[in-house]
Structure formats: structure tokens, C-alpha cells
Swiss-Prot record:
One of its GO terms (biological process) is saponin biosynthetic process. GO terms for molecular function: UDP-glucosyltransferase activity; UDP-glycosyltransferase activity. It is an enzyme of class 2 (transferase). Mainly expressed in flowers and flower buds and, to a lesser extent, in leaves, stems and roots. UDP binds at S282, W346, A347, H364, N368, S369, E372, Y386. Component of the oleanane-type triterpene saponins (e.g. saponarioside A and saponarioside B) biosynthetic pathway, leading to the production of natural products with detergent properties used as traditional sources of soap. Pathway: Secondary metabolite biosynthesis; terpenoid biosynthesis. PANTHER family: GLYCOSYLTRANSFERASE, SOLANIDINE UDP-GLUCOSE GLUCOSYLTRANSFERASE 1. Coiled coil: none annotated. The gene is UGT73CC6. Keywords: Transferase. This is UDP-glucosyl transferase 73CC6. Its EC number is 2.4.1.-. SUPFAM superfamilies: UDP-Glycosyltransferase/glycogen phosphorylase.
Length: 487
């Protein structure tokens, strides 16, 4: 039996990146390999409960003072403006020499780092160990990004931001508009240069690891491997492996503001596929007028629902009175009739989605939420906002055909979400399309994918085989290196 590997995991300090990569780290630790997650002091509190005999944390103080940040602000979930985001990014860059020193003085057998740490590719090369790139996205989205590069990119051939174009060269016909592309794709800027730097660092790396399963987008895994010249390991959905018990589902990295019993007792009273779940991830705070439109659409749709709303808890000093974002008597009426539940803060999303009464999900199309929706087998209403979320929308609606669009027309920076209102009529129509008779076929396809997701993570499933194959590859590389040193 080969000796265990020594692996370092370096997650980006944002929930959408930290949660899936820490879950990936746990998969390796559960196989008996020695895993160290490198993170900052405040972020360690989110991960401490996952430490075991084979999973430890290495803590590095973030130089917040040098970056002009308040003590304890160490995660992008706490950032609401571009100036603070820039300071946090700068503070993170100051950690590079400290992390390099730690890794160099205690070399691992492999470095698994988020794409936002391109310098780890050169560090791994110096240490003669493989670097695995972690993308907090799916390979379909990565293929879409590749299609938007170069002088022949399809968005360069249209005459307006709202003219529909086909993304050529993909396994499926995919259509979108220029307005739905990230700003750094539409008009190259400094971030475009960063994207190219991250891409070059990826090409130097051993391969790519994603929280997905091969059967979801197999043609895109092969397509991307051919473009980039290295292998893709789909080893998810990690939540399906790690959070099979309801205790795990309700307490992931962040603490939910409602208890398991409160959620389950309400959901248990509902018919199968009758509840619509609304949540826009860990960072989205819509303006009041957009929240009002969502509430009005939920009310007029007739659907039973759970709605998770950030920034509207009673302790939030920026929160206006409920009359600013809810129709008069809305919450009281929903409670009295049992039609709806509003969760003001972090919701136990996996627990909710996995309940048989939930049949639909309105999502911002962040990859973690998307793969959780797929795993649960629910139809989706897509409401992309920024990052690669419009690409994920096209996967859901055009390739997998398990959802409908809410009607969001423009990509925005995360600080500008809700600038262009999506009206209640569009929202209501999308909810009815997923939850009504028209959504039966969508939900059927979603259930089929859910079955495939669960099979993928079982012993002998594609994700389990990929995990074991990657471990074998890394052990072979380590053993070959040791043999050369010995000779």
C-alpha cells in the first residue's frame, strides 16, 4: 500500500470559492491523505470544525492594517464596495511571500490552489511538484470563456449589445448577447490582463479540478481538455458526498439563521414539488425596489415558497423598514396562510433543496448553487448577475434544458446588481413556467440529472473513480521523484 500524500490546499477568501475547495480538501483527507488548508486567522473559524487527524489548518495573519482594512475583515462576504475589495485583494497579495516561505520550507506532494493564485504554478515548478488548479466554476463556463477570446470571438461581430449571437465551436448551439458578457470581455481592461495571466498559469499546471460530475457536461470536459492540453478531474458534487446527514446540510461553512426543525417541519407539511425556493447566494443584496418586485411576483404566482434574503435582518443598521421592500401585510399573510417563509440571512440551502416538497429554485447561477440545484433535481429560474453566471444560465436553459430565464438582460459588477429592474410580470411568468404544467418536462430532466449526480459520487461512480485516479497519479509522480533522488 502506498504511503499517504501530503497536500496543501489554498482557497480564495470568498464563500463561493472557500466552501467547495475546503470540501474538496475533505475528500482527500477522508481517503487518509495528509491535508493542510492554508488560510487566514479569521477565516479559520469557518473551517475549524472540519479538522481531523488528517486535515489541519495552517493560519497566516492577514495584514489588514497595512492594507487599510479594519481588523477581522478577511473575507469578501463582508465587502460591499470596490474600494474595500481592492484593499482586501492587496492584503491578500502581501501574503504571497509568507505562503511561499511556508510551502518551500515544508514541501508537499501537491499544491491545490484557486485560480486566483497564479504564482503557485511557478512555485510548484520550482519545488518539482504538481499544481492542481481549482475553478469555482464548471467546465462549460470555462469553454464559454475560451470562445470569447481572440479576434474571431462572436461578440465582436454583432452591431449592438442586445443582438443575439451564436457561440460557435461548442458541442451544442448556445446563444447570448454582448450585454450578458462580463465588462472585461466586452471592453478589455486590467482585469482582462489578469484573466490572461491566470490562464497562462493554468497551462503550466498539472490539471484542473472542479466540483462537478462528468455526466453533466461530458462533451465540454473533453473540449476543454483539448483546448488547454491537460486533464480535467470532475470530483463532485462534493456536497453529495459530505453532507448526506441533515446536520451537515444545515451547518456548512456559515451558520444558518434558522434551525433544522423550523425548516423541515414547515416543508414536511407541503406536497411534493410544490415549494419554490428563492436564494441569490452569499453576496447579493438587491435594492429595495427589486426585492419588492420579487415579493409581488411570489404573491401573485400562487406558489408556496421559501425566500432567503440577505441584508434584511433586524440587526442590520442599513436595513430599511419592511414597507420599503415588501407589499403591505405580505409577511404576515404568508405566515397566516402557511404559503411562505422568509429567511433573513444565511439559509440551509442543501437541506432545503433536498427536501421532496421543493420543486423549483430561483438562483443567481453561481456554480455552487447551480450544482446543488442539479443534485437536488429541481427546475430552475435563472437570474444571473456577474462573474460567469450568465454562462451557467445558458447551460441550465439551453443545454440541459432544466430551467427558464427570469429575463435579466445585463451583466453588472456585484456592487451594481439590480441597477436595471426585472419586473414582477417576468418573474411571475418564470415561476409559473417552472412550477406549473409547463415545467413537468424540465423537472423530469432535472430528476434524471440528480440520479446521475448521486451515482457519480458512489463507489465506482465517475467522480469517485476520478478522485482515486488523481490520487494514484499524484502518488506515482511523488514516487518517481523520490526514486530519482535516491538514484
Amino acid at each position: 500500500m502506498k504511503s499517504p500524500l501530503k497536500l496543501y490546499f489554498l482557497p480564495y477568501i470568498s464563500p463561493g470559492h472557500m466552501i467547495p475547495l475546503s470540501e474538496m480538501a475533505r475528500l482527500f483527507a477522508n481517503q487518509g491523505h495528509h491535508v493542510t488548508i492554508i488560510t487566514t486567522t479569521s477565516n479559520a473559524t469557518l473551517l475549524q470544525k472540519y479538522t481531523t487527524a488528517t486535515l489541519s489548518l495552517h493560519l497566516i495573519p492577514l495584514p489588514t492594517k497595512e492594507a487599510g482594512l479594519p481588523d477581522g475583515l478577511e473575507n469578501f462576504i463582508s465587502v460591499n464596495d470596490l474600494e474595500t475589495a481592492g484593499k482586501l485583494y492587496y492584503a491578500l497579495s502581501l501574503l504571497q511571500p509568507v505562503i511561499e516561505e511556508f510551502i518551500t520550507s515544508n514541501p508537499p506532494d501537491c499544491i491545490v490552489s484557486d485560480m486566483f493564485y497564479p504564482w503557485t504554478a511557478d512555485l510548484a515548478s520550482q519545488l518539482q511538484v504538481p499544481r492542481m488548479v481549482f475553478h469555482a466554476a464548471c467546465i462549460f463556463a470555462m469553454c464559454m470563456k475560451e470562445s470569447m477570446r481572440g479576434p474571431d470571438a462572436p461578440h465582436l461581430k454583432v452591431s449592438s449589445d442586445y443582438e443575439l449571437f451564436e457561440v460557435k465551436g461548442l458541442p451544442d448551439p448556445v446563444f447570448m448577447t454582448r450585454a450578458q458578457l462580463p465588462d472585461y470581455v466586452r471592453t478589455p481592461n486590467g482585469y482582462t490582463q489578469l484573466m490572461e495571466m491566470w490562464r497562462e498559469a493554468e497551462k503550466k499546471s498539472y490539471g484542473v479540478m472542479v466540483n462537478n460530475f462528468y455526466e453533466l457536461d461530458p462533451a465540454y470536459t473533453e473540449h476543454y481538455s483539448k483546448i488547454m492540453g491537460h486533464k480535467v478531474w470532475n470530483i463532485g458534487p462534493a456536497a453529495q458526498i459530505l453532507h448526506r446527514g441533515s446536520g451537515d446540510k444545515i451547518e456548512r461553512v456559515h451558520k444558518a439563521v434558522v434551525g433544522e426543525n423550523q425548516c423541515l417541519s414547515w416543508l414536511d407539511t407541503k406536497e411534493p414539488n410544490s415549494v419554490f425556493y428563492v436564494c441569490f447566494g452569499s453576496a447579493i443584496r438587491f435594492p429595495d425596489d427589486q426585492l419588492y418586485e420579487i415579493a409581488s411576483a411570489l404573491e401573485s404566482s400562487g406558489a408556496q415558497f421559501i425566500w432567503a434574503v440577505l441584508g434584511k435582518d433586524s440587526d442590520n443598521s442599513d436595513s430599511n423598514s419592511d414597507s420599503e421592500w415588501l407589499p403591505a401585510g405580505f409577511e404576515e399573510k404568508m405566515k397566516e396562510t402557511g404559503r411562505g417563509m422568509i429567511i433573513r440571512g444565511w439559509a440551509p440551502q442543501v437541506l432545503i433543496l433536498d427536501h421532496p416538497s421543493v420543486g423549483g429554485f430561483m438562483t443567481h447561477c453561481g456554480w455552487n448553487s447551480t450544482i446543488e440545484g442539479v443534485s437536488a433535481g429541481v427546475g430552475m429560474v435563472t437570474w444571473p448577475l456577474y462573474a460567469e453566471q450568465f454562462y451557467n444560465e445558458k447551460l441550465i436553459t439551453q443545454v440541459l434544458k432544466i430551467g427558464v430565464e427570469a429575463g435579466v438582460e445585463e451583466w453588472n459588477l456585484w456592487v451594481d446588481v439590480g441597477r436595471k429592474l426585472v419586473k414582477r410580470e417576468k418573474i411571475e411568468a418564470a415561476i409559473r413556467a417552472v412550477m406549473g404544467e409547463a415545467g413537468v418536462e424540465m423537472r423530469r430532466k432535472a430528476k434524471e440529472l440528480s440520479v446521475k449526480a448521486k451515482k457519480a459520487v458512489q463507489d465506482g461512480g465517475s467522480s469517485h473513480r476520478n478522485l482515486m485516479a488523481l490520487i494514484e497519479d499524484l502518488q506515482r509522480i511523488r514516487d518517481d521523484k523520490m526514486s530519482k533522488v535516491a538514484n
